[in-house]
Amino acid sequence: MARGNQRELARQKNMKKSQEISKGKRKEDSLTTSQRKQRDSEIMQQKQKAANERKSMQTREK
């Protein structure tokens, strides 16, 4: 039974560690939800534009 307890303690320790890491990432960001959405939408638009350019270059080559 000791192993079951050991596994449980290790699981709790890992969960606590991962929560601290995720909290740290959010604090570094320090953006509001709307600012984060705006930033993410700009990034996605840039990616989409680059993908469209690559696609148009491939169709021109054919």
Swiss-Prot record:
Span list, region Disordered: 1-62
Keywords associated with the record: Cytoplasm, Nucleus
Subcellular location per the Swiss-Prot or TrEMBL entry: Cytoplasm, Cytosol; Nucleus
GO cellular component: cytosol; nucleus
Biased composition (Basic and acidic residues): 1-30, 50-62
Primary site of residence: cytoplasm
Reported function: Positive regulator of amyloid protein aggregation and proteotoxicity. Induces conformational changes in amyloid proteins, such as APP, HTT, and SNCA, driving them into compact formations preceding the formation of aggregates.
PANTHER family listed in its UniProt record: SMALL EDRK-RICH FACTOR 1
Protein name from the UniProt record: Small EDRK-rich factor 1
Organism, as annotated: Bos taurus
